[in-house]
Amino acid sequence: QMCIRDRNNPWFMILTLIGSFGSLGLVYWKRHNHPTNLYMLGLFTSVESVALGTLVSFLDQTIVLKAIIVTAFIFLGLTLFTLQSKYDFSHMGTWLYWSLLILVGTGLVQMFFPYNHLFELAYSIVGCFVFSGYVIYDTWLLQRRLSPDDWVLANVSLYLDIVNLFVSILRLMNGSSDE
């Protein structure tokens, strides 16, 4: 069998993780070289879709569908709010950056400890807030600060915001259904 079909193969997840970071680096490196930037964006999107597809293959279909719908409504609402808002969201960048670092660090530390349902719940809720903040911040950057030449980076930023918000909502819904 191919390793893609074997969901329990840890090497597959490691390869998709390496592929995600590698293709993200290539997108950043070639962001101003047209049409190479399109190929790199396609590669990044493909690798991310394989990783996300593998993740959702472990979960109940109804939970995945609910998470997709909730993510879509949250993203649409936050985007519309940001586009019509007169607020300056530039101050959010530093807070979001440090929140993300704390979230990643906490997740890495948690890998070495036994599963804790309350920690998973809190981690998912914080993730939802952080990535909702990133949707607002990156939409504001796209609208007010980024030049038209930076559309590839803006695309990747919003894509990662949506994917990470979806994964946080998915973790939250999956954790609440396990009770």
Segments (PLM) and residue ranges:
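A hydrophobic alpha-helical transmembrane-helix feature that marks the membrane cores
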Residues: Q1, R5-E179
